Amino acid sequence: MEDFVRQCFNPMIVELAEKAMKEYGEDLKIETNKFAAICTHLEVCFMYSDFHFINEQGESIVVELDDPNALLKHRFEIIEGRDRTMAWTVVNSICNTTGAEKPKFLPDLYDYKENRFIEIGVTRREVHIYYLEKANKIKSENTHIHIFSFTGEEMATKADYTLDEESRARIKTRLFTIRQEMANRGLWDSFRQSERGEETIEERFEITGTMRRLADQSLPPNFSCLENFRAYVDGFEPNGCIEGKLSQMSKEVNARIEPFLKTTPRPIRLPDGPPCFQRSKFLLMDALKLSIEDPSHEGEGIPLYDAIKCMRTFFGWKEPYIVKPHEKGINPNYLLSWKQVLAELQDIENEEKIPRTKNMKKTSQLKWALGENMAPEKVDFDNCRDISDLKQYDSDEPELRSLSSWIQNEFNKACELTDSIWIELDEIGEDVAPIEYIASMRRNYFTAEVSHCRATEYIMKGVYINTALLNASCAAMDDFQLIPMISKCRTKEGRRKTNLYGFIIKGRSHLRNDTDVVNFVSMEFSLTDPRLEPHKWEKYCVLEIGDMILRSAIGQMSRPMFLYVRTNGTSKIKMKWGMEMRRCLLQSLQQIESMIEAESSVKEKDMTKEFFENKSETWPIGESPKGVEEGSIGKVCRTLLAKSVFNSLYASPQLEGFSAESRKLLLVVQALRDNLEPGTFDLGGLYEAIEECLINDPWVLLNASWFNSFLTHALR
């Protein structure tokens, strides 16, 4: 049979059939009859389409190939024979441009004259039996069915045969010829008997015995046996009256489906109140680094040694004083804590040998800042059962905060390029197995786009701080250990660089459970004057600690250097995720990869190189009040990375809730944009669920603001 197929059919058809069988994991050496059936079906689809065009008046005409007018528009779009991804891309494109309803199964053709999809069937059995099987499977009035048999019979939806008699006769003649050729070689009987109907796996799969009894017991209420339930499900029209279907499902459900129109959605209400404040565990755009290039000092790589070396590069220290107090804290204690750090670092330098770690003296200011002896005594619940007025602490509702412009500025800054390289190529992971060439190429292109990005600096900074803090929490549980906040990078010229952002002092850390909290005081250098945006620094006490000489094109200038001090806390589980912030690189790489895949499936070739090297093309980055923002592919990479990094830095229950609930509204809006006529019930409840997550988190408030911009432009 295989030899016959290769002789009888056009090589292009044979190649397409081979691809189709390979895609479904079938062996054409074994399933030879199926191979012949696929080739026959492909040929009929192509013959159905051949010579049929639409002229300028919109009339269907038949034109032979050597006719000079063959540049007219083809009447039929051929979907059969394409790989699945490409076929669905074509179907979606047709639906978007013509407004046709999207079919559930891939059809074979689209008729531009009649504006309908066509399912072609070629059967070795009775045409009416095969027609019913097809109709039962498709269950759609919008797909036209046309069945041909090898005996010259045909059947079509509503007896509408689409083509002229001569074109159909050509198909029937070809099928009859194939049958005769097969019969001459003794292949016809086997081929005729091998045809299976359009049954599904469930219809062939008989459930018996224990599994059958379990199936009968597991049915929803009001169904006596599996057959009844199957019949109900088979007859369940997805596009029917949803209210009726819901009431059929349960007596308790009483939902009224409202059509979702362009005028239906309203903007998400953002809370009023004082502006939101910075709540990340370390400074982002406002951080200042004291750096050493090409470090080669004794003990290089030991954090404390590196920190002291970095501190020595700055000569503008002065007597510190408070410029922005913390409203609720004992501010002199923060000032004394910094003075203590300076004094104890000086003590270390006076020693003969610098120690690897430094435990701070447990002074009153550090005990206060780290909450030592502040936790209420824990009492076993069983010992309290008899206390009549036993109750939980009264906890205040969190104060609502409004969106502030600083968080958008932080995000914009995270997307920018720095003049340093923050990840080496192997940060994403060496190839363990012989990975395909394309994957490595994509990774290298992506790394080149993000290695200088400020968001990548935040990743490396977060990984270092969380790793150091978790190590110290386990190794020195009772000590107030001094932990330098360090990062490492390379200059554009490739020189190594060690950076010091400030210090952390860790409190007592007997962390038994994942959520047990370790307190710490962070002290971070900055050139940002806190008086410019005092609301951003609500949780901080800010000191002025020195003057820094900055060199620029216009000469030297002196700027005050500040120290941002605050009490903070974290847990084992938060530190564990902080240590894994490199995952953000992987997540954003996968998002870029899905964009490349979509482009490649349309062009039917790998588009990685073009995607990254075509600098003139712009891509959508996000929504703003001005509309859809666009940028280069590098900007897209950095924006996606920054979003992933901020999701990690500002992780919170508010973000989890907002992401989950707003996604539902997003899907409905996208369905409306795709002309799918969505319906909703209890839309007010969905808005309530979204808005109860908008409390005081700056990143969530910014995302809600972006969502409102998206709604405005999506529904124009």
UniProtKB/Swiss-Prot annotation:
It comes from the Viruses. One of its GO terms (cellular component) is host cell cytoplasm. Its cofactor is Mn(2+). It holds the Pfam family Flu_PA. Keywords: Cap snatching, Endonuclease, Eukaryotic host gene expression shutoff by virus, Eukaryotic host transcription shutoff by virus, Host cytoplasm, Host gene expression shutoff by virus, Host nucleus, Host-virus interaction, Hydrolase, Inhibition of host RNA polymerase II by virus, Manganese, Metal-binding, Nuclease, Phosphoprotein. InterPro entries: INFV_PA, PA/PA-X, PA/PA-X_sf. Plays an essential role in viral RNA transcription and replication by forming the heterotrimeric polymerase complex together with PB1 and PB2 subunits. The complex transcribes viral mRNAs by using a unique mechanism called cap-snatching. It consists in the hijacking and cleavage of host capped pre-mRNAs. These short capped RNAs are then used as primers for viral mRNAs. The PB2 subunit is responsible for the binding of the 5' cap of cellular pre-mRNAs which are subsequently cleaved after 10-13 nucleotides by the PA subunit that carries the endonuclease activity. HAMAP family: INFV_PA (MF_04063). Influenza RNA polymerase is composed of three subunits: PB1, PB2 and PA. Interacts (via C-terminus) with PB1 (via N-terminus). This is Polymerase acidic protein. It comes from Influenza A virus (strain A/England/878/1969 H3N2). The lineage of its organism: Viruses, Riboviria, Orthornavirae, Negarnaviricota, Polyploviricotina.
